[in-house]
Regions:
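Amphipathic terminal alpha-helices
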Residues: 290-306
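N-terminal Rossmann NAD(P)H-binding glycine-rich loop of SDR-like oxidoreductase domains
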Residues: 1-22
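NAD(P)H-binding glycine-rich loop region in Rossmannoid oxidoreductase-like domains
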Residues: 38-81, 92
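Catalytic helix-loop patch of NAD(P)-dependent Rossmann-fold dehydrogenases
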Residues: 71-74, 78, 82, 105-172, ...
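A conserved pocket-lining segment of Rossmann-fold NAD(P)-dependent short-chain dehydrogenase/reductase
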Residues: 125-129, 169-171, 175-177, 184-209
Length: 306
């Protein structure tokens, strides 16, 4: 029996549909009630359900975007940092395994030394490494609450991100989710709706691929720890726009900001994370995701408007 926390959100709904399609028994729980309620009530709910594993899809992202988190910091902190700590403690007491949906938005820019940011790299877009958005700061703090901390590597290398003892569950990092269904949370919907776009290079996660990969971690019992769950490769905003046009989904003329400074002065209240993640750890564990360009093209060829 799987306890599914946050089953009504964008990611949680996809996870619920996956479990239903596989005929896996699950019980839905409210993240807000867990964060604001007693640990005893949460523990009793898990015991009553006979839960053997918990998936936490709950979190606070802000609507329509992370700028909203700057105006609702209490709920953002509760959803992204307090809740994971409660889950870790109660599941630990009951010897229940867990998986937590984190975010790759705790990184920004290029990784020193090249390549994508790895799971063992300390975040560089966080409260400890500002500037960052409040959202990204709380997501990095959420990983700290789950036992991860910065450690020096020496020789001038970027600091490591290590668990204080040994990982007790999965930390699945999502990055800019999208799929084939028009939705305000869908990256492809956002790209089409913005008046002007920021040119950037990013890793992305196709939503159904993401939840399938997360569940495969549980099925295959891959080692606990952090995993960057992104479709292999990276794309620029221009490449995404070109695919949108190529597939006939939207033929409008897309406008771009001159640079990030232009974007920040005209359209944003808080800094944005743009980064590439290294997904090789997941692949080496035997969990394979299709390349990001293939996933984008499939989603656009099967595009369904709301």
């Amino acid at each position: 029996m799987i306890a599914l926390v946050g089953s009504t959100g964008y990611v949680g709904s996809a996870f619920r549909q996956l479990l239903e399609s596989k005929g896996v028994a699950f019980k839905t729980l409210s993240g807000r009630q867990i964060a604001n309620g007693s640990k005893k009530d949460f523990a009793d709910a898990l015991k009553d359900a006979g839960a053997t594993f918990l998936v936490n899809c709950a979190g606070y992202t802000g609507k329509p975007n992370v700028d909203a988190c700057e105006l609702d910091k209490g709920n953002c902190l509760d959803g992204n940092a307090v809740l994971p700590g409660v889950i870790r403690e109660v599941c630990g007491d009951l010897s229940i395994g867990w998986g937590h949906v984190s975010s790759g938005c705790i990184f920004g820019g290029e990784r020193p030394g090249g390549g994508g940011w790895r799971e063992d790299d300390a975040p560089n877009f966080s409260f400890r490494k500002p500037p960052c958005s409040f959202y990204s700061g709380t997501k990095a703090l959420g990983e700290e609450v789950l036992g991860y901390k910065e450690a020096e590597r020496g020789d001038g290398q970027w600091p490591a991100w290590e668990h204080e003892s040994s990982p007790e569950g999965y930390v699945w990092r999502l990055r800019i989710p999208f799929n084939h269904l028009d939705n305000p949370r869908n990256y492809l919907t956002k790209v089409q709706s913005y008046a002007t776009l920021l040119q950037a290079t990013n890793s992305l996660s196709q939503l159904e691929d993401f939840v399938a990969a997360c569940y495969e971690c549980v099925e295959k019992q891959v080692p606990y720890g952090i995993y960057n769950v992104t479709n292999p490769g990276a794309v620029t905003t221009s490449q995404v726009v070109d695919l949108i046009k190529k597939t006939g989904v939207n033929g409008k003329e897309f406008q771009f900001f001159e640079d990030e400074a232009d974007f920040m002065s005209k359209a944003a209240k808080t800094p944005r994370s743009n980064c590439v993640l290294d997904e090789s750890k997941l692949r080496d564990a035997g969990v394979i995701m299709r390349p990001v360009e293939e996933a984008l093209e499939w989603s656009l060829k099967n595009w369904r408007k709301a």
